[in-house]
Amino acid sequence: MKVLTSFKENGGEFVTFSGGEPLMFKNFPQIISHAHDLGLKSTVLSNGLLWSGKLIHDLALFIDEIQFSLDGVDEETNSMVRGSGHFEKVVDTIVKFANAGVKTSVATTFTYDNLNENTQTRYKNLVDLIKEKTSGKDVFFKLSKKLLPGRDVHFKAEENEKYSAIIKDIEKHVDENADYENFLAGHTANLVAINCGLGGISVSSDGNVYFCNRINEMESFGNVTEKPMSFFMEKGKEIHLATSVENVIPCKDCELRYICDGGCRIDDFDFAGKIQSSALPYHQISCNDEKKNKLKKRMIDSFNYFYKFD
């Protein structure tokens, strides 16, 4: 509670609760209510399993956005990742939150184990089913296009490129214009993108503070029990600017720097997210002319999709 209060007092506006599963913490209802009372905009990332009808009724008012993990298109494929008997419960929770008026999204990360020749059709059927049950209310569907490392598993760039192509085909099967819409949705009007988000504060369950939500790959900059929130907020701003496209090589001289924002500071930079053990200047190491040309084409195609000219 004190951390949230201090965050707000130092200019904080948005907070995301994740885990694990936030509802595993018994005082979560009091925490989300307190965040709402402070005027913070709250997002919750949940696996969807612990929500009762009463909890949804009691807490929906305090939640600005909720995202559920659903890593398959049905019970069979979801159980390969999340365990058996969970799929219908999560779908039901998704529908109830959307119908309660909360901005609701469904995040899906397929694995090679549960992808098959029928995934495109079955995923579209799932999307259509949820839309039908939510009476036209906006539910946002997100497909992860990158396999992140974890549990001693690491993926090569070539593997992720292959995976991304498969996922984009699934998206296109659901909505042939998805790539255009995703591009423009990721670029807010009149907002200059200078960073991937490095510098945003992530507080782990033990109070350690990181400046990216991929905390297992980052360094801690201290603990909220030992340093004031003002310190972390100032340090986060400092890191955000130091690693912005205006200050890294070769991005600072690229005409596309405010469109691509430089990419991930863990995956695409020489310091791999490890600020404290790295020295200036920082370098983007994954960009090339082929990627630039693809980005230019995607930008132009998206623009032409939304704006028609005689």
Regions found by a protein language model. Give the residues of each.
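Conserved alpha-helical substructure of the radical SAM core
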Residues: M1-F62
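Alpha-helix termination/capping residues and helix-transition junctions
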Residues: S6-E9, A60, S135, V248, ...
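N-terminal pre-triad scaffold of radical SAM enzymes
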Residues: F7, G12-F17, G199-V203, G207, ...
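Flexible loop residues that form catalytic
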Residues: G20, G48, D71, K146, ...
